[in-house]
Every structure is written in C-alpha cells, then in structure tokens.
Amino acid sequence: MEYRILGKTGLKISRMGFGGIPIQRIDAEGTKALMHKLLENGVNYIDTARGYTVSEEYLGIGLEGIREHFVLATKSMSRTAEAMAKDIDISLKNLRTDYIDLYQIHNAPPADLEKVCAPGGALEALTAAKKAGKIGHIGITAHSLETFRMALELPWVETIMFPYNIVEDQAKELIHACAEKSIGFIAMKPLAGGAIEDAVTALRYVCANPDVTVVIPGMADIAELNQNLAAVNDSSPLSVEEEAKMRAIRDALGTQFCRRCNYCQPCSAGISISSVFLFEGYLSRYGLADWARSRYATLTKKASECIGCGACESRCPYHLPIRSMLKEAAEKFGE
C-alpha cells in the first residue's frame, strides 16, 4: 500500500481509505471484520459522518482495540457553533474515542460556508475542539465548485473532499491547486455514487492523478475490499484498453445522472428517488431489465407519483432536473 501525507495535517495515510456510507447496510460484527481486514492490508484512513445513520456507532464497535492504528475522519452538517459542538461530542461518543483526527464541515454550499465562518458559526466550535484536543484537524467537504474555490482561500482549511471520477473531472485544476497549497485532497464518489459499475477501472483512473491524496470508495464486504485493493495497488500506467473503457463509460453516463447522495430526500410524495434512478440505470444501461423491473416493483411509491413540487431539485447539489428524470423513468417502466 502506498502512503501519502494528508496536506497540512502531516498525517501519513494510505492511498485508499474506507468510505463509511455502505456499512449502514450491514451490522456491527460485519464492520468489525472489515476493520481488521483493513488493518491487515495497510488501509489506515476511515471516513464517516454524523449523517450516515449508524455508521459512526458501527465503526466505534469495529475499531475497539485497534483505534490507534487508524486516521479517523468524520463530519457534520451543523452550521452554528452550538450545534457543531454537540455533534463533535456525539461523534466522540459514537466512535468510542477521545479524539478524532479530522473533523469536516459536511457539504456546505457557498451561503452555508459564510454562516460557518461568521461569528457564532460552526468554525468557532471546531477551533475550540481542536484547541481542547478533541479533534486534530479541520476540513471541508463539498459538491459545489464555487465552495471548492472558496475553501482554497481559507487559511484554516487543511483538507478538501470533493467528487472526482471518470465522468466528473471538472475540479482537476482545483485539485492541483490543493497540492500546490499543501491542502490534502480526498476524492469521494470514485464510482460516481455507484453509477460506474467497473470499480477497478474507476479507481485506477482516480489514482492515476498524483494530486489526489486519498480515494475513499465505500465498501460493505471483504470481497469489495479485495477488489479495490487490487486496483489501488496496481501502479502501472493506464493501458490503451483502460482508456477505451473510460471513454465508453463517459459516453454511456454523460453528466445527467444520479450520484445517490440522497440530499434530495425526503420526497414530499414519499418516492425513494435514488432507488428509482438506480433501477432505471440497470434497465437502460446494464441490460438487466428483468431484475430492474422486479426491484422497481418493490418500491412503495413509483416515479409516476411525483407531484411536481420541485423540493428535491432545490436540494440537489448537482442541479439535476429530477422531476423530468422521474417522468422519463416512469415511462421506461411502463407507467
């Protein structure tokens, strides 16, 4: 496993980290098995969040007895000092630790970032927690290029997390700026939220960029971990065949697709929006029509039940035309 220094933090971390979203689908014992497998294979960076339901709690159980071998990162959507201070304490309790290596401001659009930095904003609590030894370093995660640009100019920002993958490389210049400013860059959504099926090619693409400090694919089992390890540990140049695969993936996905971040939820009509688009993808792109239709049939609310309120679109960090996409999905499923 290759190791990198995470920017200004000085922390030595593995080139591949562990994305903590998918462990919401397993259990505490399964998480413990994964943590020990990470340790065996030299993966020492773990990412989670207050908003990932039971992820922090499962990781707290899974890391018992081996916490000191890992660089632990979490994040909070809180924007005020009071709320952030509470979240930091909850994270410490959930993770069963007395310190967190990196605490991040989670998905702050430009207006929210201004609130964070204002008097009484979340930055005050983060700074106080750092001074008290509760957290080691402060970072930010974003889905907006404007937020990324703003974060690059903030002296307290030690790391930036942003989507980077085969079909989303708009931030390449900003990622390079991170390297120039000694800001650690954490590549999230290397598989575009599951839209890219070929995990090996996807991870090989991300790791081919020397400005990426760490990539954090989500993993829910040891088979996924082993596959990802094989991809990241392969340091050979990208082949002609791999480049061709990447072009095909770009052509198939374009830019208008769901990354399954679920920031659009809750839907006013009760539709599981990301599930609709997941099954629609399998129907349209991957030739699994029967499976996609059978899974879609299990949804309690179908795409055709969209009431057109637009609340989801106002929350989508990718500005997707969700209402029209739901209409298209409904038509494909014969509604």
Question: Which ranges hold each PLM region?
Answer:
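N-terminal binding-site loop/beta-alpha segment at the start of enzyme catalytic domains
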Residues: M1-F70
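Conserved, mostly hydrophobic/aromatic
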Residues: L6, F18, I46, L59, ...
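Conserved residues at the C-terminal ends of beta-strands
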Residues: G19, A49, Y103-H106, T141, ...
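Glycine/proline-rich, positively charged
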Residues: I26-E29, H36, E40, R79-I186, ...
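Structured C-terminal cap/extension of enzyme domains
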Residues: L39, V43, E173-A187, L191-E335
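Short catalytic-loop micro-motif centered on adjacent basic/acidic residues
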Residues: N44-A49, A73-T74, G136-G139, T159-P163, ...
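Short hydrophobic/aromatic-enriched beta-strand-loop microsegments
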Residues: H69-L72, V157-N165, S236-E242
